[in-house]
């Protein structure tokens, strides 16, 4: 049986596919801190690095598919875009290519520049994804907070022999740094929105505040 779509139905169908792709790949990227791979050497760190590379590749493919399905072919150029490109250009111009001290970080920085424009594209295509990405980011903070509390009370193993509190990271430094980044987002969401997001923001903020002391 052949299924035929009207013009409006086809447009909605393609829009749903674009939104689904952006949601899945964006959630994968935001969940990077939770990833680890014990099969790799130093899997806590390298697992996150490889996952980030995979998520970036999938987001790039998703952008191509989104454009092919009829998405906008361009995004408005803004001042932050120019400042970011200027900073990237200065970094490349001043990088010592003969010594080449940090090739991995240079690649990572280039991926962050690409990520900026990929997010700009997806959020222009589907502005509703802002709320979804906020929810996923706060959810990762909540998971990290619960993970840390389990480690403090002996219900989960720490990833470092000298520290009891590491979350999904190797030591408490990046763990607390990540919670410090997510906490203001949770507080802003709790104060800015109402109903579901309001209460979820307070739950995440409360859980994060309990852990570091």
What residues fall within each predicted segment?
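Transmembrane signal-anchor hairpin modules in multi-pass inner-membrane enzymes, especially those
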Residues: 1-93, 99-107, 111-139, 188-204
């Amino acid at each position: 049986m052949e299924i035929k779509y009207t013009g409006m139905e086809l447009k909605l169908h393609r829009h749903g596919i674009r939104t689904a792709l952006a949601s899945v790949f964006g959630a994968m990227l935001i969940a990077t801190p939770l990833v680890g791979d014990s099969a790799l050497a130093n899997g806590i760190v390298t697992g996150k690095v490889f996952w980030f590379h995979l998520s970036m590749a999938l987001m790039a493919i998703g952008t191509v598919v989104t454009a092919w399905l009829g998405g906008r072919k361009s995004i408005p150029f803004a001042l932050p875009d120019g400042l970011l490109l200027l900073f990237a250009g200065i970094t490349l111009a001043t990088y010592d290519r003969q010594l080449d001290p940090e090739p991995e970080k240079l690649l990572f920085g280039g991926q962050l520049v690409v990520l900026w424009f990929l997010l700009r594209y997806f959020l222009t295509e589907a502005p509703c994804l802002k709320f979804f990405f906020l929810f996923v980011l706060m959810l990762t903070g909540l998971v990290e907070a619960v993970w840390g509390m389990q480690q403090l009370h002996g219900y989960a193993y720490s990833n470092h022999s000298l520290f009891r509190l590491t979350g999904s990271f190797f030591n408490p430094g990046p763990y607390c740094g990540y919670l410090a980044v997510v906490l203001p987002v949770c507080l802003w969401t709790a104060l800015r929105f109402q109903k579901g997001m309001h209460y979820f923001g307070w739950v995440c903020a409360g859980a994060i505040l309990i852990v570091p002391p």
